[in-house]
Amino acid sequence: MANLKGGTFEKQLKDAFHRLEAFGVGRVGKNDNLTHSDKLAEKREMYLKDVTNYFKSENLTDKLNILFTKENLDKFFSQRLENLSSKTQENYLRGFSSMLQGLEQKNIYIPLHFEDKSFFDDRVKIIKDEADTIIENRYINNAKEVIKNLYEIREISGLIAQTQYELSIRQAEAFELVRNPLKYLDNGFVSDLVGKGNHKYEQKEISFELEQKLLNNQSSLIDKSTYYNDLQKFSISSHDFRFTSARDKFEEKIKNGITEKEAKLQISRELNHKREAITDYYLKRTK
């Protein structure tokens, strides 16, 4: 199997786009994943630009198709699909999957297809399961006890959950911190952690206990679906830790005499936002 042609992402993107083109080619009796319409061409151009921009933001430099690994795409989709409706997420995943199948049909090497053939089906299943569950209150009662129980089920799941809860961060950001602790940890602080929209978090203090756990972790990182399944044992989702953390830290600040307005602004910055309204949203979902 071959790689995409071109010495830059832009040239490889164009090569991928042209390989998929099949305008005017009849589909009767065929079952391919090529581009037969202008509408599909527009979507695939968007997919390719989205993932190319993500790879650039991560300073990845290999051939575009070689970067289509399970690890890279898992991180890309976690960032790209966040806060989209379940139907939009599902359509995006199905469209992207079809595009990769089309490239493989044109003899382009796609690592993901050798690593995990059910990658897209598993992700869509998770989205559908979550969509079927209407979550009003995102607060986790006894969050620390839940985290303790997660450690007993699978140590790495407990570590990811504790990292999310103590630092008020998203699942994708916790995965990155667990994966590369030396890149971000510096004498009791987390620095340069990048969140949604490529925005860096303000420097965060981290407990000595959690810092040592991250630095000394020997467990292999799991994928999102495994973490999801572990959390399902407690009927919670990964983002619930961020909601719960925001509520707990807000109440702690109020107890310490900080005004409500200032506490909300501080929590918003903890969440990597800059608006009081963001904290209001988190508090409304954790009553």
Which sequence ranges carry the predicted segments?
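Short, charged phosphate-coordinating catalytic segments
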Residues: Q162-N187
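C-terminal catalytic core of Y-nucleophile DNA break-rejoin enzymes
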Residues: G195-S238
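Flexible interdomain linker/hinge and immediately adjacent N-terminus
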Residues: I108-E145, V194-K196
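Short basic/aromatic active-site micro-motif
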Residues: L231-K255, E260-R269, H273
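Catalytic-site neighborhood detector that most strongly recognizes the C-terminal catalytic loop/helix
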Residues: R269-K287
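N-terminal DNA-binding module of tyrosine recombinases/phage integrases
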Residues: M1-D38
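Basic, Lys/Arg- and aromatic-enriched nucleic-acid-binding interface segment
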Residues: I140-I169
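N-terminal core-binding DNA-recognition domain of tyrosine recombinases/integrases
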Residues: F23-V124
